[in-house]
């Protein structure tokens, strides 16, 4: 039986090779047949999951919370020292004219670009609290990629853009030189999570052991470094998952 492993579409394109390397290594170490799925958008991810085609998924924390609660997935591992943070950025310099200098400069009716990543939006709204802005106060501009969000900010088509911090920091030097980060979150306890469906059954333990065992090994560590997860992965318990879900609920309140 082949298991489909889906990687959330939250990461920079440069990471794709690393995910394929990881998939190959997990197959070798677990003895399981794994087929990698790399959807281009959140909508494509949702469709694949709804069609029952996803056996394991490296999901962002917001999606992970709903999949654990509503779809019977279980959390088995998470990256160590690799929390999901987000950045609010706007155009740098005077080229953008009235570009915001601080979060407080953003006013009701402002335009903000972002990809369809619910936890980035959720955390971003919390960071906007000093500006006294709610979700309804903002004109949201949905884009497919972080690069598109960056372009809109640089061109002054939006007042700011939301980014997954890893995606922001992986933008080219030229792009980042034209952006100014207004704020970056420091939550620490919210991470992407590897989930498995009930269909995987006892094989979930084999996947977890293969993943957790990569750290510091001659073949595993270079792959982790390629993915920007140098600390590797650690097992995640049901209690750990419930704690993170409670934290997400707090952000929603």
Q: Where do the model's predicted regions map?
A:
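N-terminal hydrophobic or amphipathic helices and topogenic motifs
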Residues: 1-53, 59-62, 219-253
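Bilobed "Venus flytrap"/periplasmic-binding protein-like clamshell domains
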Residues: 4-27, 85-150, 166
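Short helix-initiation/N-cap motifs at beta->coil->alpha
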Residues: 36-47, 136-151, 188-189
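Acidic, polar ligand-binding/catalytic clefts
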Residues: 47-105
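A ligand-binding cleft/hinge motif common to bilobed small-molecule-binding domains
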Residues: 58-70, 152-178
């Amino acid at each position: 039986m082949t298991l489909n492993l889906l990687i959330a579409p939250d990461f920079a394109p440069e990471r794709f090779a690393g995910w394929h390397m990881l998939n190959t290594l997990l197959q070798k170490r677990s003895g399981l047949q794994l087929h990698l799925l790399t959807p281009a958008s959140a909508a494509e991810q949702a469709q694949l999951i709804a069609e029952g085609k996803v056996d394991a998924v490296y999901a962002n924390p917001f999606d992970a919370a709903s999949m654990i609660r509503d779809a019977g997935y279980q959390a088995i591992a998470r990256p160590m020292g690799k929390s999901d943070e987000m950045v609010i950025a706007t155009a740098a310099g005077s080229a953008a004219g009235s570009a915001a200098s601080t979060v407080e400069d953003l006013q009701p009716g402002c335009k903000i670009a972002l990809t369809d990543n619910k936890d980035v939006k959720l955390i971003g709204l919390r960071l906007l609290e000093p500006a006294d802005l709610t979700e309804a106060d903002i004109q949201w501009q949905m884009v497919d990629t972080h690069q598109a969000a960056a372009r809109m900010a640089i061109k002054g088509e939006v007042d700011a853009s939301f980014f997954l911090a890893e995606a922001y920091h992986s933008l080219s030097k030229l792009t980042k030189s034209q952006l100014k980060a207004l704020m970056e979150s420091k939550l620490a306890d919210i991470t992407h999570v590897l989930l498995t469906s009930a269909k995987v059954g006892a094989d979930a333990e084999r996947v977890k052991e293969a993943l957790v065992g990569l750290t510091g090994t001659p073949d595993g560590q270079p792959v982790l470094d390629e993915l920007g997860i140098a600390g590797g992965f650690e097992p995640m318990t049901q209690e750990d998952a419930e704690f993170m879900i409670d934290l997400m609920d707090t952000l929603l309140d």
